[in-house]
Amino acid sequence: MKLLILGGTADARHLAKVMHQAQPSLELVYSVAGLVRQPNVPATVVSGGFTQFGGLSTYCTTQHIDGIVNVTHPFSTTMGDHAQQASSELGINYWRFLRPTWQQKAGDDWRLFSTKEKLLRALSGYERALLTLGQVSPKELAFLKSDQHIWLRTAVQPTHPLPSHVNWIKAIGPFNEICELALLKQHHIQVIASKNSGGSATEAKLSAARTLKVPVFMLQRPDIKGPTEENFGALIDRLQAWAETPMAVIT
């Protein structure tokens, strides 16, 4: 039995460790789009996507994959579409874990946006902004004003030159509130731009923003096709049931 984990998140790494411990005979393959850091998982690691293998369906066929569990970032929709299509074509199981969204708390000042363009354009009223949206393309950066002071925080260095008013901060979570408070104070940040990623790894910025009364421009999640599982324990139960009855298609 072989399970392909579409990873790149703390949840995915945790799932790999839990499944290895619970089902030691289950062979695990852990996929990441690119290596920010070598994942410490009890699995064969595949990086760089599946185009190099002729596509996901071809990879699953040649590697005899029996099931796919998608534990990528909540905003990673393309891989999810490919995985769902491949599992349907091949008649293998597919699960999608989607951690719960962050919810506003008392004292929060959130402004909600459906697209990154709308969010970035709305930042024009602020001189000093922290972007925690992941990679931002040159086209998207053009929505910002040249007289703004922007700090772009990502785990991976941008592949394109940044305008002079955009400063890059390399950082990999998890983050804590003390450090987030210090960052906001150091750069006199007036607004934070964030995706509603959910989870605890990057949630500290929201607490820091609440403390300093800094508004958060929150990018809402895209629609996810097909069924999802928000409870991690329930996902583990379903995977274990599948591993113990491999011939069944379990949804």
Enumerate the language-model features and the residues they cover.
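Glycine-rich, highly charged phosphate/nucleotide-binding loops
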Residues: A43-C60, K170-I178
